[in-house]
């Protein structure tokens, strides 16, 4: 289900502070490491690189214009598909 329109998009406060610090040139422009997969991508994030945790490792996500409005977790898959079970000795 979609979030109610009367509510603002969710962004973790600590993540937003890191983004604002980079945009104001208070800290060097390097990837922002985050565990907050549920944070919504704002237009301010365009051009920044986030390292989003997928449960095992951090996945680099470079934010482009098309990603605005989506969640950070959508771009860091948590599951790997290894194929359906097949009889390997059947060949």
Curated annotation (Swiss-Prot):
Pfam families: Ribosomal_S19. It comes from the Bacteria. Keywords: Ribonucleoprotein, Ribosomal protein, RNA-binding, rRNA-binding. GO terms for biological process: ribosomal small subunit assembly; translation. The keyword NADP does not apply. One of its GO terms (molecular function) is rRNA binding. One of its GO terms (cellular component) is cytoplasm. NCBIfam families: rpsS_bact (TIGR01050). Protein S19 forms a complex with S13 that binds strongly to the 16S ribosomal RNA. Belongs to the universal ribosomal protein uS19 family. This is Small ribosomal subunit protein uS19. It comes from Metamycoplasma arthritidis (strain 158L3-1).
